[in-house]
């Protein structure tokens, strides 16, 4: 408070330590405790408690208040000298050891122990103690092989190759093998024959087109050549598309990409529509 604050007169009582209150026997606390079986000098709580052995003479005395005038936490101790011993005590202990008849080797061992204790105390006060906790040993995790699902077209081709390997050729004399093979092998052979026929027909068509004589009209020849090239490219694209469909999978958008794709598609549709553009730009049609 400053000088402008109201003046307060404080009178020092005759009992500054408040000993009259602690020694009085007419108070409410003393009466209720004595009614519960407490007597002056005894401890509070059950006498047959598990922690009764931990009580000392200080437990029966009055509670003492310590003024906290620092910013340390509760229970923290102020800084003290780590050695906390009078100077020259080590030399005095060594002198007493020599007088008692101890050898120099024993005195050096004791001095080394004292030095180690001093260093440990200094390190504990200077730096926080580090405790290492073992976190176990590093071990290699078991790698589970990833099973990739093959497309149906490749799987069927492999089965057909296996069946064709077991089927004997037309020139071979093995009649028993043809009897053992079921209807599946016959179907696979028919499919292979049809594929080979189609391939041969395509090659024959190409040869015929190349062996035809050149026509007199240059425009007709150019048209025919372009048509041939377009047919060949179409056939190649169809064959490549059939193989690529079997091998590659459709990449479907997942998560937020689905909503983003829809939003972009709606924007494109709105830009392509004249009515929506007029509504956006507030133009009367």
Swiss-Prot record:
Domain named G-patch is located at: 25-79
- What's one GO BP annotation on this UniProt entry? rRNA processing
Q: Which N-terminal residues, if any, form the signal peptide?
A: none
**What does the record give under GO molecular function?**
nucleic acid binding
Basic and acidic residues biased stretches: 152-163, 224-234
Q: Does the keyword Magnesium apply?
A: no
Q: Name one GO cellular component term.
A: nucleolus
* Subcellular location per the Swiss-Prot or TrEMBL entry: Nucleus, Nucleolus
Q: Where is the composition biased (Basic residues)?
A: 1-11, 190-208, 254-263
Q: Does the keyword Lipid metabolism apply?
A: no
What keywords tag this UniProt record?
A: Nucleus, Ribosome biogenesis, rRNA processing
**Which superkingdom?**
Eukaryota
InterPro entries per record: G_patch_dom, PINX1
Q: Where is this region: Disordered?
A: 1-23, 144-263
Its family remark reads: Belongs to the PINX1 family.
Q: What does this protein do?
A: Involved in rRNA-processing at A0, A1 and A2 sites and negatively regulates telomerase.
Q: What is this protein called?
A: Protein pxr1
- Which organism was this protein described from? Aspergillus niger (strain ATCC MYA-4892 / CBS 513.88 / FGSC A1513)
